[in-house]
From Swiss-Prot:
UniProt superkingdom: Bacteria
Compartment(s) of residence: Cytoplasm
Family according to the record: Belongs to the eukaryotic-type N-acetylglucosamine kinase family.
Annotated pathway: Cell wall biogenesis; peptidoglycan recycling
Stated name of the protein: N-acetylmuramic acid/N-acetylglucosamine kinase
Catalytic activity, reaction form: N-acetyl-D-glucosamine + ATP = N-acetyl-D-glucosamine 6-phosphate + ADP + H(+); N-acetyl-D-muramate + ATP = N-acetyl-D-muramate 6-phosphate + ADP + H(+)
Species per Swiss-Prot/TrEMBL record: Clostridium acetobutylicum (strain ATCC 824 / DSM 792 / JCM 1419 / IAM 19013 / LMG 5710 / NBRC 13948 / NRRL B-527 / VKM B-1787 / 2291 / W)
GO terms for biological process, alphabetical: carbohydrate phosphorylation; N-acetylglucosamine metabolic process; N-acetylmuramic acid metabolic process; peptidoglycan turnover
Matches recorded under PANTHER family: N-ACETYL-D-GLUCOSAMINE KINASE
Entry EC number(s): 2.7.1.-, 2.7.1.59
Cofactor: Mg(2+)
Length: 306
């Protein structure tokens, strides 16, 4: 039996789906992280190989019957990383087609259930990716928390901390974030933020979790929080604008989907994003995610079989 394999290689877990050529999912398997940017090459190789061999063992299938394997992972735009990941699969003895793509590409394919369209992702980080009917693709954002990721949870969290400290110093507009952030982090004073930010090994996810505080403050009527969320929505729209213009989609009917806890769970931000989009690109249709990234990898693998 011919089949394809789709793999979503994440920083916290790896998700694989094995499907027939007519998109019937036969099996899915989960393993640990396989992001080459946050795990060692040896660990990524072990996870990917165990994942594939465990799945095939459960199905009783041989690797020779696999028509194509698609792996989507962060940072896979780089040729060097693509080659490293491909070699990991080749070492299993697989001689078929291997497609290594950025994780945004498999998220788009899964979300819309086809390869053409646009996806905006805003969780801890942010990125926009699009592909047109001619097969041209473009991305905007996704440069990481230090130099980019505008409109992400991390971006919102950092802006919230800065606004709170400006309020505390009397050099900025008064905001209830000043006290709400301390309460959320269980800190006694604003001076304690120094230890929290610089010395405690705080993670990007912890900073991004402050989006809940900002959203709560907005609901209470805090104007500073409202501006932070609206600015995040505008930044996400600008990433879409860049992709739309590069791919010449300005006057075309395009399907767009959104992913990530920030854009999908903060209603005001999502509504403002939609307003920006509808005002500038009324032909763009926004839909909810239809399927997950692992299935998106299946779609891409299958499309490369023809």
């Amino acid at each position: 039996m011919k089949y394809v394999i789709g793999i979503d290689g994440g920083g916290s877990k790896t998700h694989m789906k094995i499907s027939t050529l007519d998109y019937k999912v036969l099996l899915e398997v989960f393993k640990g992280p396989s992001n080459i940017n946050s795990s060692t090459k040896e660990e990524v190789k072990r996870v990917l190989q165990e994942l594939i061999m465990e799945g095939l063992g459960k199905l009783g299938q041989s690797l020779e019957e696999c028509s194509a394997i698609c792996i989507g992972t962060a940072g896979a735009d780089r040729t060097e990383d693509k080659s490293i990941i491909e070699d990991m699969i080749r070492s299993l003895g697989y001689m078929g087609k291997i497609i290594v793509v950025n994780d945004a590409e498999i998220a788009l394919a899964g979300g819309i259930e086809k390869r053409e369209g646009i996806i905006v992702i805003s969780g801890t980080g942010s990125i926009c990716y699009g592909r047109n009917k001619e097969g041209r693709s473009a991305r905007s954002g996704g440069w990481g928390h230090i130099i980019g990721d505008e409109g992400s949870g991390y971006d919102i969290g950092i802006k919230a901390i800065k606004a709170a400290l400006k309020s505390f110093d009397k050099r900025g507009e008064k905001t209830i974030l000043e006290g709400d952030i301390l309460d959320f982090l269980k800190l006694k004073s604003h001076e304690d933020l120094i230890n929290y930010i610089y010395r405690s090994g705080v993670t990007k996810k912890e900073i991004a979790s402050l989006t809940r505080v900002v959203n709560s403050a907005y609901i209470k009527g805090d104007l500073v929080s409202k501006r932070i969320l609206k600015e995040a929505a505008r930044e996400l729209f600008l990433s879409v604008k860049a992709v739309v213009e590069v791919l010449s989609m300005q006057n075309k009917k395009v399907v767009l989907t959104t992913a990530g806890g920030v854009i999908n769970n903060i209603n005001y931000l999502y509504d403002e994003f939609r307003k920006f989009l509808n005002l500038n690109y009324p032909k763009v249709k926004i839909i909810s995610m239809k399927n997950d990234s692992a299935f998106g990898a299946v779609i891409i693998a299958r499309s490369e079989c023809d």
